[in-house]
Amino acid sequence: YLYTLRWQIINKMDGIEISIRELFPIVMVGLATNNITPAGRGGGEPVRAYILSRDKGYPMEETFATVVADKALDTFPFVFLAILTIIGITFYFKLDLWILILMIVAVIAIVACLILLIYMSVNPKFGKKVDNWIIGLIRRFYKKNSDELEQKVHTVIDGFQDTMKLVISDKRILHYALPLSFIIWIFEILRVYVVFLAFGAHVSPIIIGEVFIMASLIGMIPLLPGGLGAVDGVMILFYSTAGISASLSAAATVIERLISFWLATVIGMLILPHYGSSVLDRISLSSKSDDESDDELLE
């Protein structure tokens, strides 16, 4: 519900009027797509934008910009918590230096991508460079209908920049959407805390938060759908390292993943047929290479 509320706030900033009741199933399909595509938890974002654009008649560049803004707002608290986690694990866990370096590099990469995205949104010259770079790729790999596709690129990037500027400059981002993002991450950690309480274990929320953030970083690596297996293993390993028994760590992790991963996936997959076979095509495209995905997204 909170994910849906945040996206609704962003949509309203862009003049897209849609109720939470209508947005909620789209969000669930997006979450399910994130879980089944090895795209660093980003495979569901184009699907969300596509469904909203198709069903409500808004331009794709506008709906995609609201989805990107929503993802960026989710990234801000994650980066903040990731920095605190890297500092904290030096006290709670004895990790090899290369693991710490890898986590630091991952956070720096996320921050760099976020800065580039925002900079492209507010700087027309940089946006033009991105435009020209994409056009260069089109001319190199796509010979047929390249002029038409180039025009689509111009339209999408211009519309994306206009929408992002509008969203970024709106004070409701700071007053409502950003605080809501922190609340969402707090509830994510509290969910794990409640799972441990259900087993009669009182685990420090700090340890839970650190393990959860580390597992989330692993889950963003686009190797397995939703970080399947890797996230579970990391959570069990680090809970055990923190002094929690292996059996309790495994049981709590399985229950938590049933709630956060499998429940969301099943609900999203049950809702998916409602939106038709074209959405399945989008999900298939999300699993392909970045170049192919970008091309189909523009179409």
Labelled PLM ranges:
Residues 3-29, 195-211:
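Membrane-embedded helical hairpins/re-entrant loop segments and their flanking transmembrane helices
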Residues 57, 139-160:
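Short, membrane-interfacial amphipathic segments enriched in basic
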Residues 158-161, 165-214:
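Transmembrane helical segments that form the transport core of multi-pass membrane transport proteins
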Residues 16-25, 58-60, 95-98, 172-173, ...:
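Membrane-helix interface segments
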Residues 20-25, 100-107, 174-179, 205-210, ...:
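Hydrophobic alpha-helical transmembrane segments
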